[in-house]
């Protein structure tokens, strides 16, 4: 990613870089292997382009930067325009319709020069003596009135707006009139030559996907021409430069010899990594031989290392991208063998979300409301690329967003789609028996979920004695309930399990939860606020029979049964 301040500071530079060469002096054969194409295709992609390198690279993502007059005039030369056209033609001739694989995405090789050419055409639009890109940076449209994102967040009529409880109300919906371009901009601006040219140029993009968003743009442009009493010819792209995600093709023929490895292996990836990615990931250099790797990594003797990997010649170079290397043989090598440790489970998968997320953008009918994570679609996205990014299948993505057709032709840019459902997990419970305290026998208390991580000490007050309830309590992602159990002179509790001791608390109608207690720090709960990431609470000083009422902005409230009383979070120091 180019630094954001690059373009705004370009006018300060006393020189320009007169040539663009995207791969520089990298080895063509290595690049061809990594992109799964020919060296002739890579040579065409890597040819020198007669454009200022800094502004040309920035033009490939033109909307990311603020353009000055010096930036635009440096880029927009006739030599650069001709060179970009020649570059695109050369890649078409050398690569044809043969796809390349880059970062797991299968696409036409021509998509690379087209990215730069599209940016050049947009930045270099003119109306008379004016540069439209510079003008467009000052355009302002009308504000669209929308409800705050937390307008309906609690589900409580006391706090949420009355509209939240009306059937069919959608706080993120946009009024039909607000979707019209003619309603968002003043007529003098919308009908100006630059405005129409820029909008038309967007429609000419080779990366504009077929589907609902493109149809929306075409509809708006036709509406604008009618509104402005003008006519401008245009045609949307018919080519598809993105073909989807790479799939692994299994080789035919005899399987390789079966070997057993007692140590870690370098496993092939799907899609396969390029040579550069492999060397970066495993800290080896291109051209390393098996003998080199043995000396660097293996604990086994060289004959055992070669045998474990079915290698005939120790100095044979490693040329196959999908070749797995065994570091240690099956027998116990000198110095001992490596024993892999079990993985530590941490909720990172798409299904491990325990609360409903708030969409970052409008959603359309068909997206499941029980969604743990949303993704806002941007230009160039497809169903399979979104699924690949979030580690789910396309079928799973479509099941979470049933309005999307099988061809993924109605994916809308700037709309939010669900990529992970809310996962409901039944937490196992354990029973903890409490020892006898000095002033009474404490009854068994139903306690916490099985520990996941961390360590915290919880205490209860029995008469005037502080008794440790559970030494190995755990930090968890969920909330346990609270129940009152009678003891001779004290209270036994089933405590809430929280992710972290924090700063906010929401309590209502404690119903005299603090019975027979003194003025001591205590936590008084009747409802628990579930936030998107963590639940946060802090101890407060309460009096017998008192209830604390404080609204925390934005949480979703889930009622839980409350049967008890006092929780002391290790406050006696």
Swiss-Prot record:
Give the signal peptide as a residue range, or say none if absent.
1-18
A Pfam short name: LysM
List UniProt keywords, sorted A-Z.
Answer: Chitin-binding, Glycoprotein, Secreted, Signal, Virulence
GO cellular component: a single term? extracellular region
State where the protein is found.
Secreted
- What does the protein in this record do? Might have a role in sequestration of chitin oligosaccharides (breakdown products of fungal cell walls that are released during invasion and act as triggers of host immunity) to dampen host defense.
Q: Which organism is it from?
A: Arthroderma benhamiae (strain ATCC MYA-4681 / CBS 112371)
Residues of this chain annotated as glycosylated in UniProt: 46, 71, 283
Q: What is this protein called?
A: LysM domain-containing protein ARB_01155/01156
């Amino acid at each position: 990613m180019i630094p954001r301040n690059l373009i705004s500071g370009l006018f300060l530079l006393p020189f320009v870089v007169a040539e663009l060469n995207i791969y520089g002096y990298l080895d063509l054969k290595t690049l061809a292997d990594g992109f799964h194409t020919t060296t002739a295709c890579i040579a065409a992609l890597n040819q020198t382009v007669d454009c200022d390198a800094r502004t040309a690279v920035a033009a490939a993502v033109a909307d990311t930067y603020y353009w000055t007059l010096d930036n635009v005039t440096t880029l927009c030369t006739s030599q650069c325009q001709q060179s970009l056209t020649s570059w695109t033609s050369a890649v078409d001739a050398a690569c044809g319709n043969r796809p390349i694989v880059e970062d797991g995405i299968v696409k036409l090789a021509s998509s690379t020069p087209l990215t730069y050419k599209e940016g050049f055409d947009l930045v270099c639009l003119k109306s008379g003596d004016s540069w439209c890109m510079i003008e467009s940076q000052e355009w302002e449209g009308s504000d669209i009135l929308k409800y705050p994102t937390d307008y309906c967040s609690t589900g409580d009529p006391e706090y949420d707006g009355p509209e939240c409880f009306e059937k069919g109300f959608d706080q993120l919906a946009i009024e039909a009139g607000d979707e019209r371009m003619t309603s968002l901009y003043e007529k003098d601006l919308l009908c100006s030559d630059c405005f129409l040219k820029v909008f038309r140029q967007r429609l000419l993009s080779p990366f504009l996907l077929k589907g609902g968003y493109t149809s929306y743009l075409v509809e708006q442009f036709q509406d604008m021409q009618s509104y402005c009493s003008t006519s401008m010819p245009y045609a949307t792209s018919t080519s598809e430069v993105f073909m989807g995600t790479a799939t692994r093709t299994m080789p035919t023929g005899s399987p390789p010899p079966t070997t057993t490895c007692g140590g870690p292996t370098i496993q092939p990836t799907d899609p396969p990594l390029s040579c550069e990615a492999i060397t970066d990931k495993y800290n080896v250099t291109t051209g390393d031989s098996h003998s080199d790797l043995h000396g660097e990594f293996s604990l086994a003797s060289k004959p055992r290392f070669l045998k474990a990997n079915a290698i005939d010649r120790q100095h044979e170079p490693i040329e196959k991208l999908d070749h797995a290397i065994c570091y240690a043989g099956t027998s116990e090598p000198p110095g001992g063998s490596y024993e892999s440790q079990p993985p530590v489970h941490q909720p990172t998968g798409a299904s491990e979300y325990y609360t409903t997320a708030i969409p970052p953008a409008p959603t359309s009918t068909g997206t499941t409301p029980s969604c743990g994570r949303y993704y806002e679609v941007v230009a160039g996205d497809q169903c399979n690329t979104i699924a690949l990014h979030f580690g789910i299948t396309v079928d799973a993505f479509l099941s979470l967003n049933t309005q999307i057709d099988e061809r993924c032709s109605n994916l809308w840019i700037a709309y939010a789609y669900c990529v992970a459902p809310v996962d409901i997990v039944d937490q196992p419970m354990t029973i903890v028996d409490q020892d006898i305290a000095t002033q009474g026998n404490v009854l068994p208390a139903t306690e916490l979920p099985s520990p996941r991580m961390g360590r915290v000490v919880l205490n209860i007050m029995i008469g005037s004695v502080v008794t440790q309830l559970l030494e190995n309590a755990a930090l968890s992602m969920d909330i346990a309930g609270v129940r009152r159990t009678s003891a001779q002179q004290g209270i036994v509790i089933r405590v809430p399990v929280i992710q972290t001791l924090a700063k906010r608390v929401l309590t209502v109608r404690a119903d005299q939860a603090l019975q027979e207690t003194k003025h001591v720090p205590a936590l008084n709960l009747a409802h628990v606020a579930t936030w998107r990431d963590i639940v946060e609470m802090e101890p407060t000083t309460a009096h017998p029979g008192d209830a604390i009422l404080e609204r925390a902005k934005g949480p979703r409230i889930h009622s839980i049964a409350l049967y008890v009383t006092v929780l002391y979070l290790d406050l006696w120091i």
